[in-house]
Amino acid sequence: MLTPPINLHAWIEEHRHLLKPPVGNKCIQQDGFIIMVVGGPNARTDYHYDEGPEWFFQLEGEMVLKVQDEGVARDIPIRAGEVFLLPPKVPHSPQRADGSIGLVIERERLPTEQDGLQWYCPQCNHKLYEAMFPLKNIETDFPPVFDRFYRSPALRTCSQCGHLHPAPERYATVEG
């Protein structure tokens, strides 16, 4: 049975209170594609690795999509009204401004595919840590990987330059 159309603007107004940290992300449909509305602000330091493409449509405000492009860190600004198709297998870290709202569309993963979360040294861009896993639910599969990385000073210390990657405030007791 077909689902009825969604009035996206009305959906956003009704759910705007959910599009804030710490999650800021709500899946509105999932049937072949994962269609999410994502609000800012956020302060992610991880890079997401997806074996498929991702489509970004910035509805309100702006964002910067940090990417690792052939070993070089780059910033791609995406402003309200703009769309961007990220090719498969490009590590990316969406940085959303306060009050911003975007639509992100990813295809559902094939049974053989894995997602990844990666962290790079903010000083020298050396890859610090990578975890690959089959993605079932973006809202529940990411947090254990975040916890593993941020709770471990060993994982966060760069083997190239010795810099300790900062952890979010909620992990502050790990370093104390």
From Swiss-Prot:
Cofactor note: Binds 2 Fe(2+) ions per subunit.
Annotated binding of substrate, by residue: 54, 96, 106
Listed pathway(s): Cofactor biosynthesis; NAD(+) biosynthesis; quinolinate from L-kynurenine: step 3/3
GO terms under biological process: anthranilate metabolic process; L-tryptophan catabolic process; NAD biosynthetic process; quinolinate biosynthetic process
InterPro entries per UniProt: 3hydroanth_dOase, RmlC-like_jellyroll, RmlC_Cupin_sf
Necessary cofactors: Fe(2+)
Major enzyme class: oxidoreductase
Residues that, per the record, bind Fe cation 1: 48, 54, 92
Positions that bind O2: 44
EC code: 1.13.11.6
SUPFAM superfamilies for the chain: RmlC-like cupins
GO molecular function, one term: ferrous iron binding
Secretion signal span: none
Positions with a binding annotation for Fe cation 2: 121, 124, 158, 161
Keywords per UniProt: Dioxygenase, Iron, Metal-binding, Oxidoreductase, Pyridine nucleotide biosynthesis
PANTHER family: 3-HYDROXYANTHRANILATE 3,4-DIOXYGENASE
The name this protein goes by in its record: 3-hydroxyanthranilate 3,4-dioxygenase
Organism in which the protein naturally occurs: Xanthomonas axonopodis pv. citri (strain 306)
Top-level taxonomy: Bacteria, Pseudomonadati, Pseudomonadota, Gammaproteobacteria, Lysobacterales
